Amino acid sequence: GMASKAGSVLGKVAKVALKAAL
């Protein structure tokens, strides 16, 4: 549902943020 979709998006954003931080 929406919650799982939001979690997936947050995970993607977190990964991109980690790459940017490195």
UniProtKB/Swiss-Prot annotation:
Expressed by the skin glands. Keywords: Amidation, Amphibian defense peptide, Antimicrobial, Secreted. It comes from the Eukaryota. GO terms for biological process: defense response. It is found in: Secreted. Its main location: secreted. Belongs to the gastrin/cholecystokinin family. Magainin subfamily. Antimicrobial peptide. This is Peptide PGLa-BM1. It comes from Xenopus boumbaensis (Mawa clawed frog).
